């Protein structure tokens, strides 16, 4: 990137002028990650100061039985397949209670698209979980799951959301987005929920007062132009509804092999190489610069590792996903050397060591607890890398 274009982009960002599709592609083409990270850091600081948000949550997957066979997914099993499972509602409640502690604020629930479970299983599950954990927010179901519920129930998404909200739903999850462009999506997704339905369902959720996250799965067969297109679609929807709280880039996990039966569950593996740390940081930085109307960008350390997650905080991210138990959708922690759980104290140390002030939040981004910032005498902030 020449000096003139750099200066032009800097001027636009600092003036608060919206970046275009062409600007986004130019940013991805830059090989100066230090400059790009610094520019994204200016924006995250303008929006969120020196704060890094986190929450204490748990993940619950009530069934891994799924009609789809998405190319990136290591989680799904077909009915009757070895390791396929479906929890009874009382089992799900018992497991959730076992994960409860005095700091838990959120239960994050996603499942496979089970062909035989009745629709009523899902609102009943939420209702019983809410009774058991009345002070815990229920963030549950992807737009893909809501679309599946339409199919199995014959109900509209609007009526489905009304019932789920009555049962205790406080937010949808952001999954099922992957990459929206059909050029890529047709090769990685094996279900019927594409941009039109994904956006329709989140638009409905926002109209009913729910705030939701949005995600992007990157680092597989997509190109930078597909990432830019993905963010711009979300940005346009955010202009309309204002309902997205946070954007979450998710790095595709390349090398998953099931340790129990030796099968390669990730069908994209032979066609891709996992995104490097530098590519991950570039994705966070460009996302922060393009997605000017979303307040937060989150790094999910389970998919990036804690060191890259710390660096992402200096490249546009201001939220680090909280303590996680039993996260199963994309990878097995034993294969990647990344922990499947961090305590609140672990997160506090990671945030401070990266040079930021931790702030604990709930699902609605209401502040629960503020903490002291880093000790300047022991601070050793990660330095941006060059591609």
Predicted segment positions?
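Auxiliary Fe-S-binding modules of radical SAM enzymes
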Residues: 1-34, 94, 100, 238-387
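Conserved, mostly hydrophobic/aromatic
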Residues: 16, 40, 70, 109, ...
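N-terminal pre-triad scaffold of radical SAM enzymes
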Residues: 35-79, 84-110
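Hydrophobic faces of well-ordered beta-strands that scaffold small-molecule active sites
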Residues: 52-58, 107, 138-142, 172-174, ...
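Short glycine/proline- and charge-enriched loop/turn segments
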Residues: 74-77, 182-186, 261-268
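Conserved Radical SAM active-site core
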Residues: 77-236
């Amino acid at each position: 990137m020449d000096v003139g274009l750099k200066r032009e982009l800097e001027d636009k960002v600092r003036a608060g002028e919206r970046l275009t599709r062409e600007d986004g592609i130019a940013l991805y083409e830059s090989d100066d990650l230090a400059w790009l990270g610094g520019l994204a850091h200016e924006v995250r600081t303008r929006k969120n100061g020196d704060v890094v948000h986190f929450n204490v949550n748990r993940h619950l997957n009530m069934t891994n039985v799924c009609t789809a066979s998405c190319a990136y997914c290591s989680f799904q099993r077909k009915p009757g397949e070895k390791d396929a499972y479906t929890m009874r509602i009382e089992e799900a409640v018992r497991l959730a209670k076992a994960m409860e502690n005095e700091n838990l604020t959120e239960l994050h629930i996603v499942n496979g698209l089970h062909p035989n479970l009745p629709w009523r299983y899902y609102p009943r599950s939420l209702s019983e979980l809410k009774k058991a954990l009345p002070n815990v927010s229920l963030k549950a179901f992807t737009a893909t799951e809501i679309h599946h519920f339409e199919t199995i129930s014959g109900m509209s998404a609007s009526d489905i959301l009304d019932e789920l909200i009555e049962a205790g739903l406080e937010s949808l999850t952001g999954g099922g987005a992957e990459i929206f462009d059909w050029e890529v999506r047709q090769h990685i997704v094996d279900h019927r929920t594409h941009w039109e339905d994904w956006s329709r369902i989140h638009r409905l959720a926002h109209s009913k007062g729910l705030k939701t996250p949005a995600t992007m799965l990157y680092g597989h067969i997509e190109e930078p132009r597909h990432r830019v297109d993905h963010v711009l679609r979300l940005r346009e929807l955010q202009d309309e509804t204002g309902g997205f709280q946070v954007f979450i880039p998710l790095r595709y996990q390349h090398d998953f092999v099931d340790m129990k039966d030796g099968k390669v569950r990730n069908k994209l593996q032979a066609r891709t190489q996992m995104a490097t740390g530098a590519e991950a940081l570039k994705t966070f930085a460009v996302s922060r610069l393009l997605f000017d109307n979303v307040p937060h960008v989150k790094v999910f350390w389970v998919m990036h590792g804690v060191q890259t997650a710390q660096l992402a905080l200096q490249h546009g991210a201001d939220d680090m996903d909280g303590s996680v138990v039993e996260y199963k959708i994309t990878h097995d922690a034993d294969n990647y050397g990344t922990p499947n759980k961090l305590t609140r104290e672990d997160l506090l140390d990671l945030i401070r060591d990266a040079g930021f002030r931790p702030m604990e939040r709930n699902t609605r981004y209401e502040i629960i607890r503020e903490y002291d910032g880093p000790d300047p005498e022991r601070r050793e902030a990660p330095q941006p890398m060059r591609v």
